């Protein structure tokens, strides 16, 4: 191998040149470093100078602004000074006016001091009057308390008296209702007695006239024809005259209003009296002696029920009038039924008149004196009215069931008659409550 020097070319620089170059590079690097450090210092100084310039500019702006503010303050102070001077002028004028008012007030004060003596005298007089008024007020308070005590006593007394009056009114109402019940019961008893009398008389007359019925047939037909020609309104005044003959029963003026108040009858009294006519037609037969036959032409298979009323078989459903009057003309039967219907209507109206007479007072009249109760109790009513017994009604019901063949069904007419029997007392109570 060859060393470093063996292969070196001829004509090249030695390593000294390299060293010189390295030295030059080091010197240049040192110079660059020094120059760069100096440049940095200069830049810092320039930055500081710029900051100072900015601060000085800010301070200058502040000073200028403060200067402008001070100028404005000077202007405002000048204006305030001018305003204060004007206010001072006004206050001086007011002060002069107040001084004038003070002088006038002093004059008024002197006058008021002069008037104080008079006012003190007036105050003393008013105090005396106040004491008198207080005494009067206390006295009136005592009187007011006394009046209140008397008022409470009077109120309690009034309540007690009103309670007693209410109790007395209740007792009087109870007595009045009892009197109405008694009068209704008396009316029913009298009606039953009259019915018994009339039934006994009718039984006797039928026994006597049973033998001479064929002779009286023409007269009966003539009487029926005459009654059919008469208007139905002729029967109502007749019943009214009968009531007037019996007396007013301590209630004058009721009879004049009877016909105008027929519409006030309960529904049971306003029903057509068909059942009453049938009952009267059967009643004439029920009181015949059970031992005698009704007529010679009575069929042998006819029987008499347990009430004494003759019954009919289903094979002979003839009317009781045909049995009573044998051989009579069939054309006269409607007239006889019409006559019986009119007579029943007349009896019903007379019963209504008696019911109205049994009341203590009328709707359009003042209450009747209780002393007239004896007159009402002594009133016997119309002797011509005919009552109805429950046994007769049951007999009529049995007779109607046998004629109709309904096998024991209830009869509407019998219910109506029962309702009619209970109507007088109930109607009197209801009418009395309506008047109260």
Curated annotation (Swiss-Prot):
Q: Which residue stretches are annotated as topological domain Lumenal? A: 36-436
Residues in coiled coil: 35-198
Which residues in this protein are found as Phosphoserine? 233, 275, 328, 332, 366
Q: How does it sit in the membrane?
A: Single-pass type II membrane protein
Per UniProt, the ranges with Acidic residues bias are: 399-418
UniProt lists compositionally biased (Polar residues) regions at 305-321
Keyword entries, A-Z: Acetylation, Coiled coil, Membrane, Phosphoprotein, Signal-anchor, Transmembrane, Transmembrane helix
Positions carrying N-acetylmethionine are 1
The residue ranges crossing the membrane are 15-35
PANTHER family hit by this protein: GOLGI PHOSPHOPROTEIN 2/GP73-RELATED, PROTEIN GOLM2
Q: What is this protein called?
A: Protein GOLM2
Look up and give the organism this protein is from: Homo sapiens
What's the gene?
GOLM2
